[in-house]
């Protein structure tokens, strides 16, 4: 099945091709077939995207917020009306099963556009009384923003970054991952159809050099990245050269803590969602599952039973529950972590093998008897590999859960809500769940601490990261100067 777009890039309101750029083959992970071939952005394409964005942004910012909101709301409606065809494209691009993409990818993007459309007219300043004088504040857009996406949720990420940027009066040049480049082009088309003026959301394709060129350009006021910690470090350093605003959502090695009074089926379901959904390729996954000793074996037995029942296969089959990893390179990486876990003494409970050939499939895999020092407990795998660790006391598990450089997410399962709140208050994570896991509604802020990132996406908190405050002092009387 082919999914060739009209052109590799979308700049100034139209598809744009420049075949001089290095080729980017788009491979369907389920069978290894090339479904499209794009080209990397040349310097001319990058310049056109930045120039048109900078030019269009000023008029866009001058519109009433409600006028901007109408366009984003129309785009949200268009996405929902076309969700099935967009979800099929997302499945072809990523390998995620259709039963996931129909509910979790473009629908979340539509939610973001709708949410920020509703929020935009309510973003106002404040008045500070100072006797007869006063100060008022204005929230102003930052200007030209750069968004850099990841390959695991390409279309959702594009929407999560574009929605607040555009709603608040900014322009954005977006570079999707070269592994999954197709969804962002569809978003650009839909925004234009909804009435967005040309130049405000441009899409350019490419690898790291293209991202570096965007981030280092003097016209760029803000960078929003979703990616790995090494990429984040490089982008952060480049943005710092120009003292640019930065939001980063990076990796994680998140703890999911299950106390012995938890509802076992719910806790197991959450652990599976937090390790096997999207074939485990989710940054916030709870890949360190801490289970209190008294229920560990019962937890593992039922977990293995449910994991073995997961239906793998063609992701376009609506009955399939788990698809392939995104690429052969990711498959090789995940299999290497499985071998390390075996070598370091992990007890394989289920899975552990490549599965369903051709394609980049790995069975849902669970290791028990994992200790804090093992590679599987320290490094982000980004695949369907769960590490189960046991614990005895609340104090112990809090200390061990926090003993990581990451701090993206955490979860707690217990029937004792007092304990749940007490534990969550001590966990070093930007996003926490109690008796739930990996639910990320756009109404709530999302982001990490420590090496997992800076800033927040979604919720009202995103306003802080796409606007700047101007203070205006108003003197109501004569100026009293001492000279």
From Swiss-Prot:
The protein's annotated catalytic reaction(s) are: betaine aldehyde + NAD(+) + H2O = glycine betaine + NADH + 2 H(+)
Q: Which residues form the active site?
A: 161, 249, 283, 457
Enzyme class comes to: oxidoreductase
Q: Which GO terms describe its molecular function?
A: betaine-aldehyde dehydrogenase (NAD+) activity; metal ion binding
PROSITE patterns per UniProt: ALDEHYDE_DEHYDR_CYS, ALDEHYDE_DEHYDR_GLU
Q: Name one GO biological process term.
A: glycine betaine biosynthetic process from choline
Cysteine sulfenic acid (-SOH) occurs at which residues? Answer: 283
- Residues recorded as binding NAD(+), renumbered to this chain, are 149-151, 175-178, 228-231, 251, 283, 380
Manner of cofactor binding, per the entry note: Binds 2 potassium ions per subunit.
Q: Which UniProt keywords apply?
A: Metal-binding, NAD, NADP, Oxidation, Oxidoreductase, Potassium
What stretch or stretches form a coiled coil here? none
Q: In which pathway does it act?
A: Amine and polyamine biosynthesis; betaine biosynthesis via choline pathway; betaine from betaine aldehyde: step 1/1
Instruction: Tell me its family.
Output: Belongs to the aldehyde dehydrogenase family.
Q: Which PANTHER family match?
A: ALDEHYDE DEHYDROGENASE-RELATED
**Description of how the protein assembles with itself and partners:** Dimer of dimers.
Q: What is this protein called?
A: Betaine aldehyde dehydrogenase
Name of the coding gene: betB
